[in-house]
Amino acid sequence: MIKELNDENLIIPLWQEAFSDSEEDILFFLNNCKNIKCLGYFDEKMLSSMLFLIDCKINGDEYKYIYAACTYKNKRCRGDMSKLLDYCKSNFNKVCLIPANDKLVDFYFERKFKIKYDLNEMQFDESEEIKEYLFEGCSLEKPFVLAHNL
């Protein structure tokens, strides 16, 4: 089941397992990002995957930016993240993300994220500190945005 998630006690442990960020950094992000929604995929009432949707614009068009998409290690390879991504693509006209590595480029491409944009075409109405969060964590030599439009 997919539902909106606001409980820091559920968000923080998954975020920490996936990205190794401190609780302080996660709380700073959660408390200071103003245009945000978290969606979680629940398996038997337990959170298994989550992602954040953050308002942004690409070349003046409104998008939902998918950020911090993650799944518990013991719940991977079951399609939970794919279900969340499908939900986003079905419920929002335009969604985008920045793949963190080459493996994820292929993963997202297979899930129909096929429109490519340069990072400087993306704009957020967020503080500079939050913008730093939104662009970090990518190991690609030349990071880029992948998008899906209905």
Q: Model features per residue range: what roles?
A:
Residues 1-28, 35-42, 46-47, 132-150:
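Short amphipathic alpha-helix that is part of the acyltransferase structural core
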Residues 10, 102-103:
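Short alpha-helical
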Residues 40, 45-57, 62-70:
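Conserved beta-strand in the GNAT
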Residues 67-68, 76, 105, 110:
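Acidic/histidine-enriched, beta-strand-rich ligand/metal-binding domains
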Residues 71, 77-90:
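Conserved acetyl-CoA-binding loop-helix of GNAT-fold acetyltransferases
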Residues 81, 103-104, 121-126:
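Short glycine/proline-centered loop/turn elements that form peptide/ligand docking sites
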Residues 90-102:
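Conserved GNAT acetyl-CoA-binding A-motif
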Residues 109, 114-136:
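Conserved catalytic-core motifs of GNAT/GCN5-like acyltransferases
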